[in-house]
Amino acid sequence: MNYQVLLYYKYMTIDDPEQFAQDHLAFCKAHHLKGRILVSTEGINGTLSGTKEETEQYMAHMHADERFKDMVFKIDEAEGHAFKKMHVRPRKEIVALDLEDDVDPRHTTGQYLSPVEFRKALEDDDTVIIDARNDYEFDLGHFRGAIRPNITRFRDLPDWIKENKALFADKKVVTYCTGGIRCEKFSGWLLKEGFEDVAQLHGGIATYGKDPETKGEYWDGKMYVFDDRISVDINQVEKTIIGKDWFDGKPCERYINCANPECNKQILVSEENETKYLGACSYECAKHERNRYVQANNISDNEWQQRLTNFDDLHQHA
């Protein structure tokens, strides 16, 4: 495989995010890179793809900058680009938690746990493990015994914690996310909320899966990623599928977006059921006049109406 996907972040000061974004986009395009990078006054958060040569040049370029000289890159091999375009966007935050009283992870953040230390925490009955990702990420794969917050956006996590505080009272709390960036800020927020014993998986699931000692042990399913790959394997010890098809509940790890552009809900669904239910999550979405599956597959009105009858006897799970 001649391509690589890079995942990285760093909390540090960028004085002029707008100018930085403009210059950085030009550099990335000149090196034929594709991906998504967010920059703000609090730092940088990026994931991009390119050939090995181009991504190595990018990392060398970043490490040559005093501000990014110690930035850690998580690297996956790939068969081609994981993105279709290149975006570098200035933002208020590099992860959107939208707190009234913001947290600076450079000053307030949970204790860092190495993959081996995190594995011990997973084995400790007195430790609560919180998945800091969204529900659809959790449903594709997660650490065994982890708590699933019922959220679809990271910014909703603090409210969910407040509503369920009894679950974590007087417990050691350990949190994890994809690459570590969300936990840097979330664990700091937990400390400010009065939780005393707070830790985080340093480098996230991506680092844990590549660790030569842990080898992704205790991870079930796949890890959701925000690029064209959709998911990657983590557990090198044993393979399990925990995802369930939206319609029939059978084991499934195939995510699609609902074909109704006004819904766009992410659902796990087999190719067979995608065809059967017109790429939609519900009858209402399947019959939507702008159904993308119907348009992309040139389905006739008669065939459309015929397939809609597949919903008649369907009892969807929640």
From Swiss-Prot:
Molecular function via GO: oxidoreductase activity, acting on paired donors, with incorporation or reduction of molecular oxygen
Alphabetic keyword roster: Oxidoreductase, tRNA processing
A biological process term (GO) from this entry: tRNA modification
Record-linked Pfam families: Rhodanese, Rhodanese_C, UPF0176_N
Boundaries of every Rhodanese domain copy: 123-217
Annotated catalysed reactions: uridine(34) in tRNA + AH2 + O2 = 5-hydroxyuridine(34) in tRNA + A + H2O
Cross-referenced Gene3D superfamilies: 3.30.70.100, Rhodanese-like domain
Protein name according to UniProt: tRNA uridine(34) hydroxylase
Originating species: Staphylococcus aureus (strain NCTC 8325 / PS 47)
